[in-house]
Amino acid sequence: MSYQITINNNTTSNVQNIVIADPNLASLGENVVFSDSQGPLSSLYVYDGVWVIKLRSPLSPGQSITITASSGTPNIDPTIALYYNNGSSYSNLTLVGSPTVSIVQDFGGYAISAYASGDFFLVASPTGFTPSSSRLLVVDRWATTPTSLDAVGLRLYADTNDWFGVVRKYVNGAQNVSIEQKISGTYSVVNEIDISQFAAFTDPLVMYLSINGSTANVKVYKQGSNIGTVSGNYSTTPYGNPSMAGYGTVDKHYANFIVLPYEPDPQVTVTPISSPSPTPTPTPTPTPTPTPTPTPTPTPTPTPTPTPTPTPTPTPTPTPTPTPTPTPTPTPTPTPTPTPTPTPTPTPTPTPTPTPTPTPTPTPTPTYDITYVVFDVTPSPTPTPTPTPTPTPTPTPTPTPTPTPTPTPTPTPTPTPTPTPTPTPTPTPTPTPTPTYDITYVIFDVTPSPTPTPTPTPTPTPTPTPTSTTSSNI
């Protein structure tokens, strides 16, 4: 990912060392190269998303320039700062350039441990440090979770040696942090900078102390966003060194300290540079996908074709009389496959589901609606009921269509039959071999002729004849 950075010098001074704090850059980490039209620029890494960039030449008031930031090897130049450390050492900072400046840190036994026990950073200027021409950029980088502490403070101090200190303390890992108004101790705190408005800090927290003349401007950055600015005066009136006693100890952590020549901050805008070109390429790919979709459409069409397959099965109906016994599965198929099947072919689509129900229905009565049937299955006697099958074939074709519609009318006319289909599936496996078995006991629920009348099939069949014949057979 690359970013475009526009720097607009809306100040009244020349600017060359630009401080950029932006969350977009944080995704690139420390491997960021900044370039203008002539190539890479010098830069100094502060923290993820926070950099100091040195322009090739000062930018005059009213001018603007556009540079880019992208992943790559940074062109680190420590001389950008008056002094700088890389955040990995607890020793005094290496001096870069002039004037003579030193930094003192208390991380458990360093130079000013006699003055305090706590978490703080101090910039000391025994000689040659002119606050009006310098600014301090501090980034705190925790290595471990801080111990139980109760407040956070950012303070500016001044004593006989012009000590300037930044003091920070955390609560629950910098969650729900409150700003402390005062620092207790034996020595007075001079012109403390009040940043109580900056509540609820979270790491990483970038503190930018800009010292210009007698005014100290503090900018607090959280995740690269400028939370706000407050100002306060400082004094060089002789005071004793400020006491930090009573603040407890904290876990060790790393910190980057950078002191820069003072310059006002120009307007900086960071925007992502995206390349949507590749996106459209995959778009056409989905277009061909719909083409294969129609192919499966014809596949369902053959589904009805297998339905007629059972049609030839009815012809050998007499022969398969014994066959049903071993194979209950095929039995239901032949029963609903009467010659008239072609006509109700469209209806058969739902037939597969009710197939078990019609099996018993066709055998007993074409005209009557079977509500409940109990069968006594006997193996050998099958041949004996030969006379029964004789009438059966005739009605068989008729019922076949009937079974298909039967499930439909049954629930409609008689509310009682509605539950009947539920039990019917249970006996269905038994009745499957109806032609093979001898029916010992049958209970029929005879419905008036009108029921079959709605079915076109019963009309051609002589209604009276089958009725009496079936009764005599039973």
Curated annotation (Swiss-Prot):
Ranges where the record places region Disordered: 268-474
Sequence repeats: 368-377, 437-446
Segments of this protein annotated with the region 3 Thr-Pro repeats regions and two near identical repeats: 278-467
Thr-Pro(N) repeat locations: 278-367, 378-436, 447-467
Keywords for the protein's UniProt record, in alphabetical order: Repeat
Biased composition, class Pro residues, residue ranges: 275-365, 380-434, 449-465
PANTHER family xref list: MIGRATION AND INVASION ENHANCER 1 (PTHR15124:SF27), SELENOPROTEIN W (PTHR15124)
Protein name: Viral protein TPX
Native organism taxonomy: Viruses, Adnaviria, Zilligvirae, Taleaviricota, Tokiviricetes
